[in-house]
């Protein structure tokens, strides 16, 4: 079994565990914010921080493979980057987040989740219409 398949199966197993655990634990985010989940940061900072790997890391990873991408792969990459530039750097400043906070643990969890997502997407990008 390839490393990619092991990674995929592991990621699916983690998703199943988290899916069922969220029936018993309410993530302290938004209206469910509560004490006991560590220090809070501003919601805007937390959002930009947790979504930033989707832009920054993808640009770093894509820089090494840009010349080998075909037109369709380049379009998918451009769509990804357009979506996440908006989601990361534009949307948080258009919505009213004044005075709202989120636990740093949630922002860190999402940050690492997005690192995995970007890495996985980057690994599969060359297989799209290759």
List the predicted regions and their residue ranges:
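Functionally constrained cores in energy, signaling, and assembly domains
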Residues: 94, 114, 129
